[in-house]
Amino acid sequence: MFNHGSLFSGIGGFDLAAEWMGWNNVFHCEIDPFCRKVLHYYWPNSISYEDIRNTDFTVHRGTIDILTGGFPCQPFSVAGKRRGTEDDRYLWPEMLRAIREIKPEYVVGENVHGLLSWSNGLVLEQVLSDLEAEGYEVQ
């Protein structure tokens, strides 16, 4: 059985998929209070973290097989102001810090299509480069 942790968990899409796969949902991290209530309802035995910016994930180093997450999309979404890396909600650096602290075997990420075109793809290139620098094969 794989151990799974989720970042920017929302109402638990990745957590539900992990459960369907038979994985153990060890923790989730979500700042929105309503979403945390949903997560607690469905996964009461999972550790719940609120704010990725204030969470030390080193306690999970070497124990998480698969880490999932999609850092907030508002900075890149065509529906928003598209402030990109200047937006306070640009949290890729925090997700990268969590990856470095946890060192999971696999990382599964998702984001909006607008990330592909933001700054001619430079943000996506940075994300991919950061993951490769940590030893991950990016596909």
Label the predicted regions.
Residues 1-139:
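Conserved active-site and SAM-binding loop architecture
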